[in-house]
Protein backbone atom coordinates (compact mmCIF):
# COMPACT_ATOMS: atom_id res chain seq x y z
CA UNK A 1 0.00 0.00 0.00
CA UNK A 2 1.19 3.53 -0.79
CA UNK A 3 1.68 5.10 2.64
CA UNK A 4 0.63 8.52 1.28
CA UNK A 5 -2.78 8.71 2.89
CA UNK A 6 -3.52 12.18 1.47
CA UNK A 7 -1.78 14.60 -0.91
CA UNK A 8 -2.14 18.37 -1.37
CA UNK A 9 -0.53 21.41 -2.97
CA UNK A 10 2.92 22.13 -1.46
CA UNK A 11 2.64 24.27 1.67
CA UNK A 12 4.36 27.62 2.15
CA UNK A 13 7.33 27.68 4.54
CA UNK A 14 7.63 30.36 7.19
CA UNK A 15 8.75 31.35 10.67
CA UNK A 16 6.38 31.66 13.63
CA UNK A 17 6.46 35.16 15.11
CA UNK A 18 3.65 34.69 17.63
CA UNK A 19 0.29 33.04 18.20
CA UNK A 20 -2.36 35.19 19.90
CA UNK A 21 -6.09 35.49 20.61
CA UNK A 22 -6.21 31.68 20.28
CA UNK A 23 -7.22 31.80 16.61
CA UNK A 24 -4.42 33.90 15.09
CA UNK A 25 -0.74 33.48 14.28
CA UNK A 26 1.68 35.97 12.73
CA UNK A 27 4.09 34.22 10.39
CA UNK A 28 6.97 35.53 8.26
CA UNK A 29 6.97 33.71 4.93
CA UNK A 30 9.91 33.08 2.62
CA UNK A 31 9.70 36.42 0.77
CA UNK A 32 9.94 38.33 4.06
CA UNK A 33 6.26 39.28 4.21
CA UNK A 34 4.49 38.88 7.55
CA UNK A 35 1.03 37.34 7.20
CA UNK A 36 -1.69 36.54 9.74
CA UNK A 37 -2.85 32.93 9.56
CA UNK A 38 -5.88 31.23 11.07
CA UNK A 39 -5.01 28.80 13.87
CA UNK A 40 -7.69 26.09 14.09
CA UNK A 41 -6.16 24.66 17.27
CA UNK A 42 -7.40 26.92 20.08
CA UNK A 43 -5.88 24.88 22.91
CA UNK A 44 -2.56 25.47 24.71
CA UNK A 45 -0.62 23.48 22.07
CA UNK A 46 1.90 22.28 24.65
CA UNK A 47 5.44 22.22 23.31
CA UNK A 48 4.46 23.66 19.92
CA UNK A 49 4.41 27.45 20.37
CA UNK A 50 8.11 28.23 20.13
CA UNK A 51 8.56 31.66 18.58
CA UNK A 52 11.01 31.42 15.70
CA UNK A 53 9.97 27.85 14.87
CA UNK A 54 9.71 26.69 11.28
CA UNK A 55 6.09 26.40 10.18
CA UNK A 56 4.06 25.55 7.09
CA UNK A 57 0.90 27.33 6.03
CA UNK A 58 -1.69 26.90 3.29
CA UNK A 59 -3.37 29.55 1.15
CA UNK A 60 -7.02 29.72 0.08
CA UNK A 61 -8.38 32.06 -2.58
CA UNK A 62 -11.94 31.71 -1.28
CA UNK A 63 -13.66 35.08 -0.88
CA UNK A 64 -15.77 33.67 1.97
CA UNK A 65 -12.78 33.48 4.30
CA UNK A 66 -11.67 36.32 6.56
CA UNK A 67 -8.07 35.09 6.43
CA UNK A 68 -6.63 33.39 3.33
CA UNK A 69 -3.82 31.71 5.28
CA UNK A 70 -4.11 28.67 7.59
CA UNK A 71 -1.38 27.41 9.91
CA UNK A 72 -0.96 23.70 9.13
CA UNK A 73 2.32 22.39 10.58
CA UNK A 74 5.14 23.28 12.94
CA UNK A 75 8.63 21.81 13.31
CA UNK A 76 9.72 20.95 16.86
CA UNK A 77 12.49 19.04 18.58
CA UNK A 78 10.99 15.65 19.35
CA UNK A 79 12.18 12.32 20.61
CA UNK A 80 15.95 11.73 20.74
CA UNK A 81 16.42 15.47 20.04
CA UNK A 82 15.41 14.96 16.41
CA UNK A 83 13.34 17.43 14.43
CA UNK A 84 9.78 16.39 13.62
CA UNK A 85 6.92 18.08 11.79
CA UNK A 86 3.62 18.18 13.68
CA UNK A 87 0.19 18.74 12.14
CA UNK A 88 -1.68 21.35 14.19
CA UNK A 89 -4.80 21.97 12.09
CA UNK A 90 -7.49 20.24 14.16
CA UNK A 91 -9.93 20.41 11.23
CA UNK A 92 -7.56 18.24 9.17
CA UNK A 93 -7.75 15.28 11.56
CA UNK A 94 -11.20 14.20 10.38
CA UNK A 95 -10.05 14.28 6.75
CA UNK A 96 -7.20 11.93 7.63
CA UNK A 97 -9.37 9.47 9.53
CA UNK A 98 -11.99 9.48 6.77
CA UNK A 99 -9.22 8.47 4.36
CA UNK A 100 -8.21 5.66 6.71
CA UNK A 101 -11.81 4.41 6.76
CA UNK A 102 -12.24 4.75 2.99
CA UNK A 103 -9.00 2.82 2.36
CA UNK A 104 -10.35 -0.02 4.51
CA UNK A 105 -7.51 0.20 7.04
CA UNK A 106 -9.96 -0.40 9.90
CA UNK A 107 -11.15 -3.69 8.38
CA UNK A 108 -9.42 -5.93 10.93
CA UNK A 109 -10.74 -3.84 13.80
CA UNK A 110 -14.25 -2.86 12.66
CA UNK A 111 -15.03 -5.11 9.71
CA UNK A 112 -16.17 -4.03 6.25
CA UNK A 113 -17.94 -0.66 6.13
CA UNK A 114 -20.91 -0.02 3.82
CA UNK A 115 -21.66 3.65 4.56
CA UNK A 116 -19.95 6.65 6.18
CA UNK A 117 -21.90 9.61 7.56
CA UNK A 118 -20.31 12.71 9.10
CA UNK A 119 -21.44 15.03 11.91
CA UNK A 120 -24.47 12.96 12.93
CA UNK A 121 -26.46 14.15 16.00
CA UNK A 122 -26.32 11.69 18.91
CA UNK A 123 -26.48 11.49 22.70
CA UNK A 124 -29.43 11.81 25.05
CA UNK A 125 -30.29 15.36 23.99
CA UNK A 126 -29.08 14.96 20.37
CA UNK A 127 -27.08 18.16 20.82
CA UNK A 128 -23.72 16.49 20.25
CA UNK A 129 -22.46 15.41 16.85
CA UNK A 130 -20.37 12.31 16.29
CA UNK A 131 -17.52 12.70 13.81
CA UNK A 132 -18.45 9.55 11.88
CA UNK A 133 -21.35 7.11 11.97
CA UNK A 134 -20.39 3.91 10.16
CA UNK A 135 -22.83 1.32 8.88
CA UNK A 136 -21.26 -2.15 8.59
CA UNK A 137 -21.78 -4.33 5.54
CA UNK A 138 -24.51 -6.95 5.90
CA UNK A 139 -21.83 -9.66 5.70
CA UNK A 140 -20.28 -8.51 8.99
CA UNK A 141 -20.91 -10.84 11.95
CA UNK A 142 -21.47 -7.75 14.14
CA UNK A 143 -24.10 -5.54 12.50
CA UNK A 144 -24.20 -2.79 15.14
CA UNK A 145 -23.76 0.83 14.05
CA UNK A 146 -20.29 2.21 14.78
CA UNK A 147 -19.86 5.67 16.34
CA UNK A 148 -16.39 7.15 15.81
CA UNK A 149 -15.05 10.18 17.69
CA UNK A 150 -11.73 11.67 16.46
CA UNK A 151 -9.29 13.57 18.68
CA UNK A 152 -6.39 15.52 17.17
CA UNK A 153 -3.38 14.59 19.30
CA UNK A 154 -0.14 16.62 19.30
CA UNK A 155 1.16 16.55 22.89
CA UNK A 156 3.83 14.00 23.75
CA UNK A 157 6.05 13.00 26.65
CA UNK A 158 9.00 10.80 25.82
CA UNK A 159 7.54 8.33 23.31
CA UNK A 160 3.89 8.59 24.40
CA UNK A 161 1.19 10.66 22.66
CA UNK A 162 -1.23 12.22 25.15
CA UNK A 163 -4.76 13.61 24.90
CA UNK A 164 -5.98 16.03 26.11
CA UNK A 165 -3.33 18.70 26.70
CA UNK A 166 -5.74 20.80 28.79
CA UNK A 167 -9.01 20.31 30.67
CA UNK A 168 -11.78 19.56 28.19
CA UNK A 169 -15.39 19.57 29.37
CA UNK A 170 -16.43 18.81 25.81
CA UNK A 171 -14.12 15.80 25.69
CA UNK A 172 -15.45 14.55 29.01
CA UNK A 173 -19.01 14.78 27.67
CA UNK A 174 -18.02 12.85 24.55
CA UNK A 175 -16.68 9.97 26.65
CA UNK A 176 -19.87 9.83 28.71
CA UNK A 177 -21.96 9.78 25.54
CA UNK A 178 -19.79 7.16 23.85
CA UNK A 179 -20.08 4.93 26.91
CA UNK A 180 -23.86 5.42 26.87
CA UNK A 181 -24.10 3.96 23.35
CA UNK A 182 -22.77 0.59 24.52
CA UNK A 183 -23.84 -2.23 24.02
CA UNK A 184 -26.54 -1.33 21.46
CA UNK A 185 -23.87 0.27 19.26
CA UNK A 186 -20.10 0.19 18.93
CA UNK A 187 -18.24 3.20 20.34
CA UNK A 188 -14.80 4.03 19.00
CA UNK A 189 -12.33 6.71 20.09
CA UNK A 190 -9.66 7.51 17.50
CA UNK A 191 -6.70 9.64 18.64
CA UNK A 192 -5.32 11.14 15.42
CA UNK A 193 -1.63 11.43 16.31
CA UNK A 194 -0.18 14.05 13.99
CA UNK A 195 3.52 13.34 14.50
CA UNK A 196 5.65 10.26 13.87
CA UNK A 197 7.93 10.24 16.94
CA UNK A 198 5.76 8.17 19.31
CA UNK A 199 5.25 4.51 20.20
CA UNK A 200 2.18 4.61 22.46
CA UNK A 201 -0.97 6.55 23.32
CA UNK A 202 -2.24 7.40 26.81
CA UNK A 203 -4.86 9.72 28.31
CA UNK A 204 -3.49 13.09 29.43
CA UNK A 205 -4.12 12.53 33.14
CA UNK A 206 -1.82 15.40 34.12
CA UNK A 207 -3.88 17.94 32.15
CA UNK A 208 -7.36 16.54 32.86
CA UNK A 209 -7.60 13.88 35.62
CA UNK A 210 -11.38 13.54 35.20
CA UNK A 211 -10.97 12.83 31.49
CA UNK A 212 -8.51 10.09 32.45
CA UNK A 213 -11.05 8.53 34.83
CA UNK A 214 -13.85 8.69 32.27
CA UNK A 215 -11.52 7.26 29.62
CA UNK A 216 -10.75 4.21 31.76
CA UNK A 217 -14.43 3.73 32.62
CA UNK A 218 -15.36 3.86 28.93
CA UNK A 219 -12.64 1.37 27.97
CA UNK A 220 -13.84 -0.99 30.72
CA UNK A 221 -17.41 -0.65 29.43
CA UNK A 222 -16.35 -1.74 25.94
CA UNK A 223 -15.34 1.42 24.07
CA UNK A 224 -12.78 0.63 21.38
CA UNK A 225 -9.58 2.68 21.15
CA UNK A 226 -7.77 2.95 17.82
CA UNK A 227 -4.80 5.38 17.97
CA UNK A 228 -3.68 6.27 14.43
CA UNK A 229 -0.26 7.76 13.69
CA UNK A 230 0.77 9.97 10.77
CA UNK A 231 3.93 11.62 9.39
CA UNK A 232 3.58 15.14 7.97
CA UNK A 233 5.35 16.45 4.86
CA UNK A 234 5.12 19.63 2.78
CA UNK A 235 2.85 18.05 0.16
CA UNK A 236 1.41 14.91 1.75
CA UNK A 237 0.70 13.00 4.94
CA UNK A 238 1.96 9.44 5.35
CA UNK A 239 0.25 6.63 7.24
CA UNK A 240 2.42 5.27 10.10
CA UNK A 241 0.03 2.67 11.46
CA UNK A 242 -1.76 1.97 14.72
CA UNK A 243 -0.22 2.53 18.16
CA UNK A 244 -0.98 0.64 21.39
CA UNK A 245 -2.42 2.00 24.61
CA UNK A 246 -0.09 2.53 27.58
CA UNK A 247 -1.68 3.02 30.99
CA UNK A 248 0.06 3.62 34.31
Curated annotation (Swiss-Prot):
Pfam families: SfsA (PF03749), SfsA_N (PF17746)
Taxonomic superkingdom: Bacteria
CDD domains per record: SfsA-like_bacterial
Signal peptide boundaries: none
InterPro entries per record: SfsA, SfsA_C, SfsA_N
GO molecular function terms listed in the Swiss-Prot or TrEMBL record: DNA binding
Family recorded in the similarity comment: Belongs to the SfsA family.
Protein name: Sugar fermentation stimulation protein homolog
Organism of provenance: Prochlorococcus marinus subsp. pastoris (strain CCMP1986 / NIES-2087 / MED4)
Gene label: sfsA
